[in-house]
UniProtKB/Swiss-Prot annotation:
Pfam families: Ribosomal_L30 (PF00327), Ribosomal_L30_N (PF08079). This is Large ribosomal subunit protein uL30-like 1. The gene is RPL7L1. Belongs to the universal ribosomal protein uL30 family. Coiled coil: none annotated. It comes from Pongo abelii. CDD domains: Ribosomal_L7_archeal_euk. GO terms for molecular function: RNA binding; structural constituent of ribosome. GO terms for cellular component: cytosolic large ribosomal subunit. Keywords: Phosphoprotein, Ribonucleoprotein, Ribosomal protein.
Length: 246
């Protein structure tokens, strides 16, 4: 019977074993520190107490919304579709704490979850109805080609695989919008400014625009109204606001 050859187990150098052990100990320490930091962060947050005035204000807001929306149902005098305008730009300029659920859902459908954000919307009867629902919290109007171009060039960002990327590469635009005939930034600007049958897909490719508002204006109501103006429809005067906040 042939003798079986003994297989030699390769020896690991002692210095390499020490390095591995030190590395594993370091990773364990880092994981423990991260866990402790997370617990401390949770402790630091604590409970958030809401003042009685806030509850009263939210209740008043909900009642006001209910009355306003009921009036819209009884007398749905929607704005007439303009002949020469097919594009609107909507900016959210008010907080929505305590508003009705319908207003919250409509704000979400318009992708205006953050205050001082804006989106392009195609002028249709359905969209005009949505704008009437959220009218006390947004301002909107009809942007011209210059405003569309300036917004997209300065603040345009795209949504690609749940990531936000700047519109600096035409290959990205062609890759995602080429099937709609949009292969460069100029094509995208044209398709937004003059809405066509693929406006929905192209506009949703863009992230909502985050406008620049002075900090003092957000804290000072008088300064805020002076800089932003009041909510509601403002027609072509939206172009002045875009240039002011872009």
């Amino acid at each position: 019977m042939a003798e079986q050859e003994q297989r030699k187990i390769p020896l690991v150098p002692e210095n390499l074993l020490k390095k591995r052990k030190a590395y594993q100990a370091l990773k364990a320490t880092q994981a423990e520190q991260a866990l402790l930091a997370k617990k401390e962060q949770r402790k630091g947050k604590g409970l958030r107490f809401k003042r009685l005035e806030s509850f009263l204000h939210d209740s008043w807001r909900q009642k006001r919304d209910m009355v306003r929306l009921r009036r819209l149902e009884m007398k749905p005098h929607a704005l007439e579709l303009p002949d020469k305008h097919s594009l609107a730009f909507v900016v959210r300029i008010e907080r929505i704490d305590g508003v009705s659920l319908l207003v919250q859902r409509t704000i979400a459908r318009l992708r205006l979850k953050k205050i001082f954000s804006g989106v392009f919307v195609k002028v249709t009867p359905q969209n005009l109805k949505m704008l009437r629902i959220v009218e006390p919290y947004v301002t909107w109007g009809f942007p011209n080609l210059k405003s569309v171009r300036e917004l997209i060039l300065k603040r345009g960002q795209a949504k690609v695989k749940n990531k936000t990327i700047p519109l600096t590469d035409n290959t990205v635009i062609e890759e995602h919008l080429g099937k709609f005939g949009v292969i460069c930034l100029e094509d995208l600007i044209h398709e937004i400014a003059f809405p066509g049958k693929h406006f929905q897909e192209i506009s949703w490719f863009l992230r909502p625009f985050h406008l620049s508002v002075a900090r003092h204006a957000t804290k000072n109501r008088v300064g805020f109204l002076k800089e932003m103006g009041t909510p509601g429809y403002r027609g072509e005067r939206i172009n002045q606001l875009i240039r002011q906040l872009n």
